[in-house]
A protein has these predicted regions:
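Catalytic metal- and UDP-sugar-binding loop of GT-A-like glycosyltransferases, i.e.
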Residues: 33, 55, 77-81
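Acidic helix N-cap motif at the loop->helix transition within catalytic regions
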Residues: 18, 39-48, 88-89
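Conserved donor nucleotide-binding strand/loop of the catalytic core
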Residues: 42-70
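Short, basic, low-complexity termini and linkers enriched in Ser/Thr/Gly/Pro
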Residues: 248-259
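Cell-envelope/extracellular polymer assembly enzymes that use nucleotide-activated donors
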Residues: 3-5
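Catalytic-site signature of metal-activated, phosphate-bearing donor transferases
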Residues: 62-68, 74-77, 86-248
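A conserved acidic beta->alpha catalytic loop
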Residues: 23, 34-43, 80
């Protein structure tokens, strides 16, 4: 069996890190890369007996690539602190690495717990993520948002879900939407994208219809309706912030440490 390192990058994840580490306990090596936590995250991780490195925050992609470089083994599973590897996925990972895997990277479906339930509708699911990969043939890429692993050659796909505790409540979701819509607008602006009233008017209702009707958000009741409305608002906010950047490019440039 090929040995595995699970990498976790952290910043003030005291509420999550212990459970994340416990879910990865089957791995041969667990590495936490912390970027200056002040809430006891590092002490909790070290108390679990895992390796902990500290490094100044330089962005999601750079931190995750650094973690992979510092791993003890070539096969990596990149786990966020608010995610859990349940037993079914654990067994599938071990079975995949038991022989010589035919692919250098594997996507996993991710299911999110929000508003009191596991959401298997809307754009929340299956939310495929490439998390299991061989570091010699794959690398994290991206700018401000939508970071992902780029694999040399085709990728495989696992069947069992990675669990994601996405938001603590609606207030948390609103705060994150505000933050990530700023980064998304900045990324679009720097890539040359521009917008106007037509896009701002059309994209939010289109996003709502896609999530609530086409992606069957209605099957999740009020939770599905709320998620669909939040998604529409997020899309609208992103385009409105892009429009604001066009008018005043310095108005929405967050400090790099806030990313």
């Amino acid at each position: 069996m090929h040995p595995l390192t699970v990498t976790i990058i952290t910043l003030n994840e005291a509420a999550h890190i212990a459970d994340a580490i416990d879910s990865a306990s089957f791995a041969d090596d667990i590495l936490v890369v912390d970027s200056g936590s002040t809430d006891g995250t590092v002490d909790i991780a070290r108390g679990k007996g895992v390796r902990v490195l500290t490094r100044e925050w330089t962005g999601y992609v750079d931190q995750k690539n650094y973690a992979a470089e510092q791993a003890s083994h070539d096969w990596i599973f990149s786990l966020d602190a608010d995610e859990r590897i349940p037993s079914a996925l654990r067994d599938e990972i071990r079975a995949t690495l038991a022989d010589d895997p035919p692919f250098h990277g594997y996507r996993v479906p991710r299911v999110s717990f929000h508003l009191g339930r596991w959401i298997r509708t809307t754009d929340f699911y299956p939310d495929y993520q490439t998390r299991l990969y061989h570091r010699r043939f794959a690398r994290w890429r991206g700018r401000y948002v939508h970071e992902s692993v780029t694999v040399d050659g085709p990728s495989g796909q696992l069947k069992n879900d990675l669990q994601h505790y996405s938001f603590s409540d609606l207030r948390d979701q609103i705060q994150r939407i505000n933050h990530y819509s700023t980064l998304a607008a900045r990324q679009m602006y720097e890539s040359g994208r521009r917008t106007g009233p037509v896009e701002i008017a059309i994209h939010p209702p289109a996003a709502f219809l896609r999530n609530y009707i086409l992606r069957k958000g209605f099957l999740d009741g009020t939770a599905g309706l709320t998620i669909s409305l939040m998604n529409a608002w997020s899309v609208g906010l992103k385009f409105m912030k892009l429009w604001e950047l066009q008018r005043s490019p310095k108005s929405q440039i967050p400090n790099s440490k806030s990313q």
